[in-house]
Amino acid sequence: MSNEEQQQPNPAAQAPEGAVTEGAAPEFNPAVLLKQLEEAQAQAQEHFDKALRTQAEMENLRKRTARDVENARKFALEKFAGELLAVRDSLEMGLDAARGETDVEKIREGTELTLKMLAQVMEKFGVEAVDPQGQRFDPDRHQAMSMQPNAELEPNTVMAVLQKGYLLNDRLLRPAMVVVSKAPEGE
């Protein structure tokens, strides 16, 4: 072989596999193509149906979740409110009984029982009173209403509680309003 023959490309050798060469005619079978088309359309319809079902399920889930959240918000206090009804009933009965009563001690006893009942309901639902009398002032749990000089107490000690604070499951619901000690002037 000469050099020229080696460099001449062979058209049949360079054609990719499965490619149609100039002399060969492609196979054309309409029945096979029609069957492939029908299978592809059936598969596409199946995927479309699945997508529609999934979309409908997601929409239903979204609606159900929104309804559940709304109901949870609406009825979150249902048990607490139900327990408070007994306290309200007790207060109403006490007021009715006090209308003709002149014995203040009986009225006081009834009020104390009602307060005890309320405290039990609050405790049952995680509401805890904060009475920081004598404790160090904590700005996260106390609200200082005033400061008073006091030589007997360390500065920043709660001297008096004007209004108790409350926690709900260890989270501050309302800070205690307090009077805080400070060092006397001149010290």
From Swiss-Prot:
Protein localization: Cytoplasm
Keyword Cytoplasm: yes
Transmembrane segments: none
UniProt organism field: Thioalkalivibrio sulfidiphilus (strain HL-EbGR7)
Pfam families attached to this UniProt entry: GrpE
Cytoplasm as UniProt keyword: yes
Homology family: Belongs to the GrpE family.
InterPro entries: GrpE, GrpE_coiled_coil, GrpE_head
SUPFAM superfamilies hit by this protein: Coiled-coil domain of nucleotide exchange factor GrpE, Head domain of nucleotide exchange factor GrpE
Subunit comment: Homodimer.
Reported function: Participates actively in the response to hyperosmotic and heat shock by preventing the aggregation of stress-denatured proteins, in association with DnaK and GrpE. It is the nucleotide exchange factor for DnaK and may function as a thermosensor. Unfolded proteins bind initially to DnaJ; upon interaction with the DnaJ-bound protein, DnaK hydrolyzes its bound ATP, resulting in the formation of a stable complex. GrpE releases ADP from DnaK; ATP binding to DnaK triggers the release of the substrate protein, thus completing the reaction cycle.
First and last residue of the signal peptide: none
Name of the protein described by the UniProt record: Protein GrpE
